């Protein structure tokens, strides 16, 4: 993580963290369909890992599901605290679809209060990684035109 701290969610489940984990595991001898790419010294990106998961690569599936569970624990805390109507999952990992959402929902169900969790809806963002930039642009537009 760019903050320099250890153990924050960014160091555990970001695309970059998952990319580093898979490279470490490949170096240690774990089998994956991404080994050839690694052996050619080509960078492995999160989109490669998601594609590998869709092609039934066990290691890629495992890493994405692990990330989903960790995010789910954090989301459970937020649900318990803020009781949101909807949780929207975005970013690179949103492209993993059910590979990220099923373990995320499972962990959220396990670690949140049922009274609060039962009415919470989950959605995958259809926006790209530029969602933050779009949000800032909309805020500025609204401020300029006085909304």
Can you name each region flagged by the protein language model?
Residues 1:
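Short cysteine-rich clusters marking metal-coordination/redox-active sites
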Residues 5-147:
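ATP-binding/phosphotransfer module of carbohydrate and carboxylate kinases, centering on a glycine-rich
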């Amino acid at each position: 993580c760019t903050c320099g701290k250890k153990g924050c969610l960014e160091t555990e489940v970001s695309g970059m963290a998952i990319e580093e984990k898979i490279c470490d595991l490949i170096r240690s001898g774990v089998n994956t369909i991404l080994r050839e790419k690694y052996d050619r010294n080509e960078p492995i990106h999160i989109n490669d890992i998601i594609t590998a998961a869709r092609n039934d690569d066990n290691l890629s599936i495992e890493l994405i599901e692990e990330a989903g569970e960790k995010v789910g624990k954090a989301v459970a805390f937020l649900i318990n605290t803020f009781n949101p109507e909807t949780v929207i999952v975005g970013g690179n990992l949103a492209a993993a679809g059910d590979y990220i959402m099923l373990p995320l929902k499972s962990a959220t169900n396990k670690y949140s209060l049922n009274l609060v969790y039962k009415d919470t809806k989950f959605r995958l963002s259809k926006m790209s990684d530029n969602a933050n930039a779009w949000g800032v642009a909309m805020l500025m537009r609204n401020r300029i035109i006085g909304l």
